[in-house]
UniProtKB/Swiss-Prot annotation:
GO terms for molecular function: pyridoxal phosphate binding. The modification N6-(pyridoxal phosphate)lysine is found at K47. Keywords: Pyridoxal phosphate. Pfam families: Ala_racemase_N (PF01168). Belongs to the pyridoxal phosphate-binding protein YggS/PROSC family. PANTHER family: PROLINE SYNTHETASE CO-TRANSCRIBED BACTERIAL HOMOLOG PROTEIN (PTHR10146), PYRIDOXAL PHOSPHATE HOMEOSTASIS PROTEIN (PTHR10146:SF14). Pyridoxal 5'-phosphate (PLP)-binding protein, which is involved in PLP homeostasis. The keyword Manganese does not apply. This is Pyridoxal phosphate homeostasis protein. Signal peptide: none annotated.
């Protein structure tokens, strides 16, 4: 199967060029913000792209990819492992991140393939994930706790995911439950600019909320913010993880109707 990757010279060239361009943008944004580019993770978003693209990204030095659909991610993680012919112990060569909204009926599957979840937004989801990850750990289906970002909703519209930041104590309650769990580890906060908001305004508000949360949860140092069109602004406001899809992989290839 590895030979199939070698035959994709054009695609590898595309991804190599795109990755260099995105890394250059990230380095420039870091320098402009007076930050070290090494403290900011570039997370390729591989949703709707094949496992062969993930294999190429891995060969180009990427160690994590993000997915937004649990079923697609589970299938792709298995395809990636088969494609490279790796053993179960070697599957960690790529860390799979869940960046989309998580349905509670998918947590058992997610607990087996996800290294990190960026979209934790309720006490019920924390409890369900804690149970599922604990079972996966006990059953030998994973080796480490699930890394967790708590997603916040800056405008209170929770239909798009996120804890309502305008509800007193809501964010702290979810963060506290993650910290009290047995199989989850709190990484930090994740946020997306609400529709119609100026990204600069949104990321500044996200930064302020992150600073507030850090006072009660000092280990929550991560800030997952910024995508293809606005990650430079997010870096200015303290993002430690930028989620880049289109600018890196191009228009989606596997989108289902």
């Amino acid at each position: 199967m590895a030979a199939d990757i070698d035959l994709q010279g054009d695609r590898e060239s595309e991804l190599m060029h795109a990755l260099a361009t995105v890394r250059s943008r990230l380095a420039a944004a870091s320098q402009a913000a007076g930050r070290n580019v090494g403290e900011i993770e570039l997370l390729p978003i591989s949703k709707f792209f094949p496992a062969t693209d993930v294999a190429i990204l891995s060969r180009l030095g990427c160690r994590s990819v993000g997915e937004s659909r649990a079923q697609e991610a589970s299938t792709k993680a298995a395809e990636f492992a088969e494609l490279l012919g790796v053993s179960r112990e070697e599957k960690s060569s790529i860390h799979w991140h869940m960046v989309g909204q998580i349905q509670r009926n998918k947590v058992r599957s997610l607990a087996q393939w996800a290294h990190t979840a960026h979209s934790i937004d309720s006490l019920q989801l924390v409890a369900a994930l804690d149970r599922a990850v604990a079972a996966a750990l006990a059953g030998g289906r994973r080796e480490q706790p699930l890394q967790v970002y708590v997603q916040i909703s800056l405008d209170g519209d929770i239909s798009r995911g996120g804890v309502n930041v305008t509800a007193p104590g809501a964010v702290d309650r979810v963060c506290a439950q993650v910290e009290e769990s047995k199989s989850l580890e709190l990484v930090g906060l994740m946020g997306i600019p609400p529709l119609g908001w100026n990204p600069d305004q949104a990321f500044e508000q996200l930064r302020l909320e992150h600073r507030r949360v850090l006072r009660s949860h000092p280990d929550a140092i991560g800030l997952s913010a910024g995508m293809s069109n606005d990650f430079e602004i997010a870096v200015k406001h303290g993002s430690t993880c930028v989620r880049v899809g289109t600018a890196l992989l191009g228009p989606s290839r596997l989108r289902s109707p």
